[in-house]
Amino acid sequence: MDCLKDDRFKGMKHFWSSVVVDRPKNRKKLDENIQAYQQEAEFSIDEKIANLSDLTGIFPLDLVINDVLHQRFCDRAIPPLGDEDKRFSYPANSGDGYIAWCIPREIIKKKTRNKKDFWIVRVTDETCVDSKIKCWGVDSIKDNLYLNRPYIVKVNFSDQWGFSTKRGTTHWKLMG
């Protein structure tokens, strides 16, 4: 869309609001829209990710993970969570579980029947496979995950429950 924007617009969000959100029917209305939406800031990185994902159906991995970070994952043999062939080839050092990397896209907060908090985190990775990880034992005050940021996560897997982690977000490490 950058090729459509000219010097009358401050940024892409200004252009989008003037042309798409409030569609002008004539040139006079376009000029009014340009003045009305003059204060629009640029799209944030999260807005760009959401727009590209919604429009194309593919997560824009290049906006989240740079080549250096991706190479670090490869050098350490940390597979993406959606890669079934490599996922269980790299066990975690202590206890049960496996290490993989992923990008949280959505956090659904729920309660068990005993009124304990848990999260269902929808994640994606370079394989474009959406997975859900259940995070048990979440402290809603202390635990926090950032959406659209790469994490290394220690996960357990069972056929009945799928992916899960214990003790809130202690098994999640922010990488970017």
Protein language model regions, located:
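Hydrophobic core residues within well-ordered beta-strands of beta-rich domains
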Residues: Y98-A100, W119, Y151
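OB-fold (S1/OB) nucleic-acid-binding surfaces
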Residues: K109-W136
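Structural detector for short beta-strands of small beta-barrel domains
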Residues: G95-N114
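Short, charged beta-turn/beta-strand-edge "cap" motif at the junction between a beta-strand
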Residues: E106, V155-W161
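Sliding clamp-binding short linear motifs
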Residues: M1-Y90, K134, W161-G176
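Short nucleic-acid-contacting surface segments enriched for D/E, G, S/T with interspersed K/R
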Residues: V138-K154
